[in-house]
Amino acid sequence: MVKLGQLLASVPEVVAAAPWLAQESDRCPALGKIVTGLSTNSHACPPGTLFIGMPGTRVDGGEFWSGALEAGAIAAVVSEKALQKFPPQNGECVIAVPDLVPVCAGLAAAFYQHPAQTLQLVGVTGTNGKTTTSHLIEYFLNQQQRSSALLGTLYTRWPGYQKTATHTTPFATDLQKQLAEALQAGNQYAVMEVSSHALAQGRVLQCGFACAVFTNLTQDHLDFHGTMENYFAAKALLFKESYLQGRAVINQDDPYGQRLIDRLPLDQVYTYSVNDSTADFYTKDLDYQPTGVKGTFVTPQGEFPFLSPLVGQFNLANVLAAIASGLHLGLDPAAMVKDLLDFPGVPGRMEQVQIRPDQDISVMVDYAHTPDSLENALKAARPFIPGRLICIFGCGGDRDRTKRPLMGNIAAQLADLAVVTSDNPRTEDPEQILADVVQGISLDIEPWIIGDRATAIHKAIREAKPGDGVLIAGKGHEDYQILGTEKIHFDDREQAREALILRYS
């Protein structure tokens, strides 16, 4: 355990903002108290907590420092604006700093004894493919007895532990705590999905990465970043010296990936490509099959025939990224290729829903929720569907509106039947979201427009003809739907199973 004064003094930005900490301990008697935890939530401050009041997009959390202290916090670190607005009246220990982002990360890393300095971290960033790529890397590491934690969109997990995630990349206080717990559990590695939000908000400050992977960059999150250049700039932060301490693994087929490659020293980069033989890692002799892909990996350590259980070219790129990362981390490439055959897959990623051996239609659930990922999923499914390809999809509310007509156009062009439905409308009008999507669909194409997602899934599966394929896109692993401000239970896979049972009853 650490005393408050010692913890605060370990962060240079705090010392610079409050030099009196070193000389005037009587000004803040709490400096001698033991810190039992960190919290950015003023309502969750048990006795002994240090409250860190982070500014948000709508409100400055630091303005609630008094509530945090009343709840049990021994001190608060807040923004200068918050302290000016609500100055201490009774000698409370409240410290203002100009920029809370590095301070929060610094305090969290120090409190949890800098777990990232012991763990070997692998960071995976990109619009699409983060989850599958990170699962593959974690799988390859564990298969070769390199114990690894996984932190990402679905969960934080390691052998014997799993907890559902609330964010793709946790906030700094939670992230450092999870890394410390992973280290304490005996893990040597931690494979992390690193979102653009996390990079822009400094959540992964105090983390140095032995390997950083860039999968691709396509339109998403423009409600947050504003422009594609801002979005790219956020992703590119992972490849700065402050984060990248080892090798970058970059998709050469992506134009933004090529820009990253051009910025970095050649000996610090592994490039990969599905088709381009100038890359360090590429494939040849490909045979795309309904159950996966067969071919040959070409690597700096030789050629390896493979059979991957993951369908589609986009998944092949994810496998290449994982193989390249594993090779950099010292894994045996032949063993990785052998283990690939038994990779269990990722929940909600081109996940087949089948209730009987003689099922006469294919049903797949995928997380595709961007124009590029929807296109990839449809193209991956198309060759193996003898009948019609039916695509059920929607777009989330309170998110990037500009991608809605793009997704409508892609579904209409690549599927035989586009079924436009609700995703997570949140606080937007669901009918307006549907209208935005339909704007991208040519007038000579007639989509089904069914606002209720369960109804859309049941109707599509009920009316599918033998040989048809139904792709349910957008939610993947999610087991909820957000309507207004309410989160209700909803799972595309459960709905698909129910619809299939009714189809055959």
Swiss-Prot record:
SUPFAM superfamilies: MurD-like peptide ligases, catalytic domain (SSF53623), MurD-like peptide ligases, peptide-binding domain (SSF53244), MurE/MurF N-terminal domain (SSF63418). ATP binds at G126, T127, N128, G129, K130, T131, T132. GO terms for molecular function: ATP binding; magnesium ion binding; UDP-N-acetylmuramoylalanyl-D-glutamate-2,6-diaminopimelate ligase activity. It is found in: Cytoplasm. InterPro entries: Mur-like_cat_sf, Mur_ligase_C, Mur_ligase_C_dom_sf, Mur_ligase_cen, Mur_ligase_N, MurE/MurF_N, UDP-N-AcMur-Glu-dNH2Pim_ligase. Pathway: Cell wall biogenesis; peptidoglycan biosynthesis. Its EC number is 6.3.2.13. Belongs to the MurCDEF family. MurE subfamily. The keyword S-adenosyl-L-methionine does not apply. PANTHER family: MUR LIGASE FAMILY MEMBER, UDP-N-ACETYLMURAMOYL-L-ALANYL-D-GLUTAMATE--2,6-DIAMINOPIMELATE LIGASE MURE HOMOLOG, CHLOROPLASTIC. It catalyses: UDP-N-acetyl-alpha-D-muramoyl-L-alanyl-D-glutamate + meso-2,6-diaminopimelate + ATP = UDP-N-acetyl-alpha-D-muramoyl-L-alanyl-gamma-D-glutamyl-meso-2,6-diaminopimelate + ADP + phosphate + H(+). It is an enzyme of class 6 (ligase). GO terms for cellular component: cytoplasm. Catalyzes the addition of meso-diaminopimelic acid to the nucleotide precursor UDP-N-acetylmuramoyl-L-alanyl-D-glutamate (UMAG) in the biosynthesis of bacterial cell-wall peptidoglycan. The keyword GTP-binding does not apply. It comes from Synechocystis sp. (strain ATCC 27184 / PCC 6803 / Kazusa). GO terms for biological process: cell division; cell wall organization; peptidoglycan biosynthetic process; regulation of cell shape. The modification N6-carboxylysine is found at K235. Its main location: cytoplasm. This is UDP-N-acetylmuramoyl-L-alanyl-D-glutamate--2,6-diaminopimelate ligase. Meso-2,6-diaminopimelate binds at R399, D423, N424, P425, R426, G474, E478. UDP-N-acetyl-alpha-D-muramoyl-L-alanyl-D-glutamate binds at S42, T168, T169, S195, Q201, R203.
